[in-house]
Amino acid sequence: KTRLCRLPEGTFDFLGYTFGRCYSTQTGKAYLGTRPSKKSIKRLIDSIHEQTERRTLLQEATLIVERLNRTLIGWANYFSLGPVSKAYRSIDAYAKARLRRWLCNKHKASSGAYIRYPDAYLYEHLGLVCLPKRTQGLPWAKV
């Protein structure tokens, strides 16, 4: 498990974070920092996929959204340090797409998921948490 690497050039994963070179969005300068590792993002995506499988179609949409929110908020609270905006946006897009697909399967709607269930419906009516908006204004999250 022990591994040596040169930090400016190489990266290493530890406790779900990838440590290595990051770039400032304002100045473009490189600095040593952290970001969520690909493995931790993949694990969260697998969890979202599992929570929105076809076998859960008999459950209420609010229950599914509560479980998704619990998972997303917990993950976002742990991974709130460093440049997380790219990871938050990709996870948010995946969660919205899976929830739309789940709703279409539940209500037997073959097409028109984005028209039938727009973002406003998912966020305001069902109460899905929006990850990119969670950490706006926090100086350490750099979102």
Residue ranges, per PLM feature:
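Non-catalytic terminal/accessory segments
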Residues: 1-143
